[in-house]
Amino acid sequence: MAVPFRKTSKSAKNKRRSHLALVASNLVSCENCGSMIKPHRVCRECGFYKGKEVKSVQD
């Protein structure tokens, strides 16, 4: 089994992990009901997309 020749320093470890940060997802408000949804997706609350009802939502 391969073993590292030298201990990885804290700065090298942190530089390697610099691209692992999580980014917050974009949220927009639904034009029909105002709930927060991901863009370009059907609203789960009211079933509308681009001003048209595309899915019937049961209450």
From Swiss-Prot:
Residue spans crossing the bilayer: none
A Gene Ontology BP annotation from the UniProt entry: translation
Entry annotated with the keyword Ribosomal protein: yes
Keyword entries, A-Z: Ribonucleoprotein, Ribosomal protein
Molecular function GO labels: structural constituent of ribosome
Keyword Ribonucleoprotein found: yes
GO cellular component term, pick one: large ribosomal subunit
Pfam families: Ribosomal_L32p (PF01783)
InterPro entries in the record: Ribosomal_bL32 (IPR002677), Ribosomal_bL32_bact (IPR044957), Ribosomal_zn-bd (IPR011332)
Family of this protein: Belongs to the bacterial ribosomal protein bL32 family.
PANTHER family, per the entry: 50S RIBOSOMAL PROTEIN L32, LARGE RIBOSOMAL SUBUNIT PROTEIN BL32
Official protein name in the record: Large ribosomal subunit protein bL32
Organism: Mesoplasma florum (strain ATCC 33453 / NBRC 100688 / NCTC 11704 / L1)
Underlying gene: rpmF
